[in-house]
């Protein structure tokens, strides 16, 4: 449980901080540098809008679910696992979509190691593991 909590925090916290920069100053160079790469520009208005929508969704849905779920899990409550499963589902779904959607743009710039680990892989891994673990705990299986 604690390993998954820590892995989730290490994975999600930098993303949420980067998105906060973007939400507070969406047209700033700092936001572009953090989210799409130093000196890079948005490919088009759809790229900008989808990034902004995902940032809002993460702050309005993913963060509250993950945070409340983590508190519930730390307290040993079943509702914590239910909220965590919801957060994990969001992380898994969004990042599987982005894994394929952004590959042609992101992969050449950052390389295989970063792309398949931190950039997308860890979000998919945490989402999958947290979803399975939460389901097992809700079913009554303890570790």
Segments from the language model and where they lie:
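Topology signature of small-to-medium multi-pass alpha-helical membrane proteins
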Residues: 1-143
